[in-house]
Amino acid sequence: MNYQAILNQIQGDIQPYLGQGKVADYIPALAGINPSKFGMSIHTIDGITATIGDAQEQFSIQSISKILTLTMAVSLDDTNIWKRVGREPSGSKFNSLIQLELEQGIPRNPFINAGAHVITDLVYSHFDDPKEAILAFTRMVSMNDSISYDYVVAQSERETGNRNLAMGYFMKSFGNIENKVRDVLDVYFHQCSLAMSCTDLSKAFLYLANEGVLPTSEKTIITKKNSDRINALMLTCGMYDSVGDFAYRVGLPSKSGVGGGIVSIVPGEMVIAVWSPGLSESGNSLAGTKALELFVNYTGKTIF
């Protein structure tokens, strides 16, 4: 299958959708990004690559980083972690406090903000320098030592992240955050600020398409069981509160971020990464979602 030709077709078809939606202006450092930007990248497990548009341009990956820290966490402790965070779709906004109160400080899943705080707290407990550990892991799986945090974005989130702090302290009151809340949230804001390109992302998550093994280095990142489980959580919980519609339209394990990125896994075959900053009301890239829908329609690459 000629993936470059397919992506070229998508680049033409997607033009009417570019610029639609709203950038994540509640994070001041992201407010000025051009919503018409668009990039897409494919990496297959046997080394085939294809890109279009702004696939080489770095952007703030935001909640896509939650896959990285979840991978680190399950490799450290894949049993006790699930006593602190659930595995169910939330059906609520990713930063909702209401559900957290009703469920005694146990977040529904690791991909909503509260759940990601718990995961970051677990990672924090295992490393002397958790920010450096997360960065080193990201560079390793992406095979790009130039990847770094965007410190302007991290500072912007720290200055405006009052709801995240509220969630952290609320869970702390239930005993579900072990370390100092502000220290954990500082790490969380930095992981969300990671600056990566579509090319970086489509390479970094190949281990999830290859039973936990990174084909670029043949290094085992996590067990097949945990790789399967992360894929399952991405399918059911990875696209905020429009996960059902996304599964209907695309049908791939995926994770989005409010920076406009989406990563999708085709198990046993490839990783697709797309970026366009204009967001839907639920916080997912509008053009990115459409591009993935077109890709699945053209290729039949869905898990169903």
Swiss-Prot record:
It holds the Pfam family Glutaminase. One of its GO terms (biological process) is glutamine catabolic process. The keyword Hydrolase applies. InterPro entries: Beta-lactam/transpept-like (IPR012338), Glutaminase (IPR015868). It catalyses: L-glutamine + H2O = L-glutamate + NH4(+). Its EC number is 3.5.1.2. GO terms for molecular function: glutaminase activity. Transmembrane segments: none annotated. Substrate binds at residues 63, 113, 157, 164, 188, 240, 258. Gene3D superfamilies: DD-peptidase/beta-lactamase superfamily. Keywords: Hydrolase. Belongs to the glutaminase family. NCBIfam families: Gln_ase, PRK00971.1-1, PRK00971.1-2. Homotetramer. This is Glutaminase. It comes from Cytophaga hutchinsonii (strain ATCC 33406 / DSM 1761 / CIP 103989 / NBRC 15051 / NCIMB 9469 / D465). The lineage of its organism: Bacteria, Pseudomonadati, Bacteroidota, Cytophagia, Cytophagales.
